């Protein structure tokens, strides 16, 4: 992580620096162990194909975690992630790049907290959105230092 980001330095319309991941089949097996999601579509190619899929697919919750990392990397240690939502629009495949992106929609003060609302999404290598959602972050303000 670089320097701490402050509320005053954020503008509506700003892009969040993208987070690029390349999940592997091994990572999917490890994720299954950690999450308890042992659905074979995430590690068994033949099983996935028998269910009409082109092959093994990445867990949706792993994509969700990438979106969470996008936000926590961006807001820094003094920021706090207040809300994170995600809905799945497509599939990601192991070995392919997943790019998490975001854009600031608005910033406001509520209950004394400096909040930033963002649209967030994940893209496959074709630039198609495979997941999208929103996040609200509580940011430190220079005026409160």
Name the predicted role of every residue range.
Residues 1-16, 94-145:
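HotDog/MaoC-like acyl-thioester-processing domains
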Residues 2-80, 144-145:
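Hot-dog-fold acyl-thioester-processing enzymes
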Residues 73-100:
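Mid-chain, well-packed structural core segment of small domains
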């Amino acid at each position: 992580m670089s320097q701490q980001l402050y509320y005053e330095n954020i503008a509506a319309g700003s892009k969040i620096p993208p987070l690029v991941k390349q999940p592997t089949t091994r990572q999917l097996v490890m994720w299954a162990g950690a999450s308890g999601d042992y659905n074979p579509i995430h590690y068994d190619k033949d099983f996935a194909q028998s269910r009409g899929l082109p092959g093994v697919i990445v867990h949706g919750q792993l994509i969700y975690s990438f979106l969470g990392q996008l936000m926590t990397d961006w807001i820094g240690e003094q920021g706090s992630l207040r809300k994170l939502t995600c809905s799945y629009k497509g599939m990601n495949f192991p070995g392919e790049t997943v790019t998490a992106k975001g854009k600031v929609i608005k910033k406001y003060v509520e209950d004394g907290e400096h909040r930033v609302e963002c649209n967030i999404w994940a893209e496959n290598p074709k630039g198609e959105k495979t997941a999208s959602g929103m996040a609200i972050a509580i940011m430190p303000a220079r005026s409160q230092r």
